[in-house]
Amino acid sequence: MAAMQIPVLDTKGDVYKTEGANDPLIYDSTIGHKKAIMLYADFSDAVMKVDTKDRGKAVLGNGIFQTLFHEQSYGKMTIEIEHVYGWRRLSKSAGKYSSRTTDSHRELFVEIFDLYPKIDFLAYDYIMVNMPRIGNTAFGERDELAIPYKGNKINVALNISSVSPYVLAHETAHLMGLPDLYTYGGVEGPKNPAGPWDIMSSAGRASGFLGWHRHKFGWLDANRKTYITSGTHRLKLTPLNASSGVSMITIPVDNLVKPSKVFVVEISQPIQNKDKVQNSIGVLVYSVDAKLATGQNPVVVYPKEDLLKAPFQPGDRFDHKDAPMSIKVLKKNEDGSCLIEVKVN
């Protein structure tokens, strides 16, 4: 089956952190060598006693963070991190700061940057600040709302209180344009419908990014994915971490040429369970809706059973009233690939 190019999804409006194309006024390319700077800041009422070198090793998971991006991108993206060790003290107590609004978050970074007058923050792609109490939050805005800095604007930066490399990966992926897949903001319908299958949904359980996010970032080569609009197709679906073969199938829901919503089929990745990697290999089916903003359920997994047991196995059939196709899983091979039949409705 010849691979067809997947269209850019139509957001049908100005959607913040969409599953469609990244906003070029905020986000840079997700290909190539990226420079990040890691800072350490605390407060008079939240004094950090841990050595910043130890803190840096912990939050990066002794290399887990860098390895994750290198492997998930198939070597197309590397992140070099420069540390500025030593805790710098902010002028007010922790309760006087917040990352909950754009204005308060921006002002927090303005003060943090002032603590480092000799550093040129414009030289870095990503700015990461370790600090207690403020939580884990990524800032990303167009110039009119961006962080003012020496007559310029900085569009993206993050602060992190967690010491999990997967939480840092989640926040870093926000700096790259990905939305939250967990639910907030009073959204009707299922809560956290992407389950443990992507870092943007569950940084504590997921081991990587869904195929769609690898596609969005430009990491998944053209011959590793295909776009099906009609007919019945039998094909071998290879795991995303394989070196060859079709690993992602996309089927449009609403428009063949310029869809805003698609269904995606791929082989599931391992998930984490109590510090162990739990294999749950099978066929994963989910929808992607570019009209929905961060936190509004832009990705929905359609599970075989529950979200922890989402992958379909040999002999299973996926058929749903909302889906533009049906799927039969015919066989699972020793290399983790699956033979499937896709019939577009």
PLM feature spans:
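Short intrinsically disordered coil segments
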Residues: K53-A58, R214-L220, V300-K304
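Residues at the C-termini of beta-strands that transition into short coil/loop
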Residues: D42, A203-G204, D289
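Extracellular hydrolytic enzyme modules, especially secreted metalloproteases
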Residues: F121, Y126-K274
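Non-catalytic C-terminal accessory/binding modules of secreted extracellular proteins
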Residues: A3-K17, K49-V50, H83, E141-S162, ...
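Zn2+-dependent metallopeptidase catalytic core
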Residues: A2-A169, G186, D254, Q272, ...
